[in-house]
């Protein structure tokens, strides 16, 4: 067995042992934790967190890059007692420099062996329940990303897929993909002409007691790298979001200067499709979405993770209504909440309010279709 294969096998052994231990985490640390300059991120992470979210992904990415391995590095083989048939004392970890590779936290390496939940599939299109933390597809900024929805779906169904729309990386829920370029164009036209109705659910800070419409124009959010040649002086674009308050909860935990924390479960229906529209609109009315690191409340984000074991963005694309691009029949596609979402719903006393989204979790390697759609 080559040295590379030995290293890879040892990495899988470490990952399997970690999964079987009580230290395995489904929710990654806060994004700020990955900015540590200390060895092993000792000032921001626990050792088991660093092992799962930094060491293992970087090692896998380094192996996948097919670069020559330095002979002086034994990597995870230092955790084994045998090397080339000889007894060895366990040695210390050798930290992999971030300069040797590209790594964007959080990297869900475990997802590479997980099949996505298929909501709907026929000979023309497929819809999946996109997990939080997954990219829809690679771009030149993250071309080395190993876990992307399009590649996973392609491998899962054995057929090329085409993008129709996108969900932000931290957002979960219904993602529609076409199985031909013609169908992709037809579906894209439906999106552009606002013929599809999208419904999101979100958990926001504070009590929202009424329903309403947010009609607030948004300037374009530019990426410092990807949009560096884009005109920054574009006029604000119209943006409209309809919202409905579904439930409220007051939890006995002190966050900031308040002795309790208040939250609301919201239904959001965007009439337009501006970048980060729902996040920016909810922040505009002073009820930011929990887990939003760009427009949200950092104290509540941390409080949600520390008190309720949920560190993800609490925004889920729950439902998509459209006309089938070939048959013309109405389709309603629904995506269920993941385990962190379900945990918050249960702890906040909201269970049963939206039972259609409270489905049981699939086994990680089942690949079973959910058939969670309504054909009208």
From Swiss-Prot:
One of its GO terms (biological process) is enzyme-directed rRNA pseudouridine synthesis. Responsible for synthesis of pseudouridine from uracil-65 in transfer RNAs. It catalyses: uridine(65) in tRNA = pseudouridine(65) in tRNA. PANTHER family: MITOCHONDRIAL RNA PSEUDOURIDINE SYNTHASE, TRNA PSEUDOURIDINE SYNTHASE C. The active site is at 168. Its EC number is 5.4.99.26. PROSITE patterns: PSI_RLU. One of its GO terms (molecular function) is RNA binding. The keyword Repressor does not apply. This is tRNA pseudouridine synthase C. CDD domains: PseudoU_synth_TruC. It comes from the Bacteria. Keywords: Isomerase, tRNA processing. It holds the Pfam family PseudoU_synth_2. In the C-terminal section; belongs to the pseudouridine synthase RluA family.
């Amino acid at each position: 067995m080559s040295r590379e294969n030995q290293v890879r096998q040892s990495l899988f052994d470490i990952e399997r042992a970690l999964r079987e231990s009580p230290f395995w985490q489904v929710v990654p640390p806060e994004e700020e934790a990955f900015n540590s300059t200390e060895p092993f991120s000792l000032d921001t992470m626990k050792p088991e967190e660093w092992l799962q979210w930094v060491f293992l992904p970087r090692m896998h990415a380094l192996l996948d890059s097919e670069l020559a391995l330095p002979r002086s590095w034994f990597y995870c083989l230092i955790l084994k007692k045998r090397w080339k048939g000889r007894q060895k004392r366990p040695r210390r970890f050798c930290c992999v420099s971030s300069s040797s590779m590209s790594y964007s936290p959080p990297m869900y390496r475990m997802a590479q062996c997980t099949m996505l939940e298929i909501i709907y599939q026929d000979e023309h299109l497929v819809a999946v329940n996109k997990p939080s933390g997954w990219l829809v597809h690679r771009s030149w900024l993250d071309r080395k990303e190993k876990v992307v929805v399009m590649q996973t779906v392609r491998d899962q169904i054995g057929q090329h897929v085409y993008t129709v729309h996108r969900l932000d990386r931290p957002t979960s829920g219904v993602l529609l993909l076409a199985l031909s370029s013609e169908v992709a164009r037809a579906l894209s036209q439906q999106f552009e002409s606002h013929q599809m109705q999208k419904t999101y659910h979100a958990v926001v800070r504070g009590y929202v007691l009424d329903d309403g419409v947010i009609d607030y124009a948004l300037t374009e959010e530019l990426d410092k790298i990807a949009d560096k040649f884009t005109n920054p002086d574009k006029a604000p674009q119209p943006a409209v979001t309809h919202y409905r308050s579904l439930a409220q909860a007051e939890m006995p935990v002190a966050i900031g200067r308040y002795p309790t924390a208040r939250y609301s479960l919201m239904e959001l229906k965007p009439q337009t499709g501006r970048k980060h529209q729902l996040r920016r609109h909810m922040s505009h009315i002073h009820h930011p979405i929990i887990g939003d690191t760009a427009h949200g409340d950092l104290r509540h984000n941390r409080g949600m993770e520390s008190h309720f074991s949920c560190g993800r963005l609490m925004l889920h694309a729950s439902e998509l209504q459209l006309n089938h691009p070939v048959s013309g029949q109405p389709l309603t596609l629904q995506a269920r909440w993941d385990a962190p979402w379900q945990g918050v719903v249960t702890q906040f006393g909201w269970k049963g309010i939206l039972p259609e989204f409270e489905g049981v979790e699939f086994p990680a390697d089942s690949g079973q279709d959910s058939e969670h759609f309504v054909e009208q």
